[in-house]
Amino acid sequence: ENLPKVVENGQDKAARLAMANASLMAGTAFGNSMVGLVHAIGHALGGVCHVAHGEAMTILLPAVMKYNLEKCKERYGELLLPLAGPEVYAATPAELRAQKTIDTLVALRQQLADLTGLPTTLSQTGRVKPEQFDEVASTALNDGAIIVNPAEANHEEIVGILREVWA
């Protein structure tokens, strides 16, 4: 709600304060949790291909959520309420809420991309080549963040995720 306001009008002090508070809350939550596969791949993309971490997270999050879906269905389903609101949550059958959460994130990401020009695929970054996927996957497998991912991932599965977010 506030991010578009700040992008459109950087002088909107109320929206900027709301964004600062959101950043503080996110940082606090992040500091008290482990990360997982999305960060392991993101760290590798940064190291191997020099993709900014925030861009990598934006590109990877929906695909990695899809990868983890069977292990995280209930938790993902709970996120639908704050993301989409009570009407959408109530209208979505419980067994479909997790996928609806991912779909909602993809739609929100596209709105943000339309507003800011943020890339939504690896090819749009201009920094990644498909020939680098093997090295990125190997690097991600050696990242400590991968240990806490709900679903184990191997080299081929990580390469598959990279292919999925390529174009």
Task: Describe the residue ranges of each PLM region.
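Active-site segments that bind and position negatively charged phosphate/pyrophosphate groups
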Residues: 1-107
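Mobile late-domain/C-terminal helix-loop "cap" segments
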Residues: 62-167
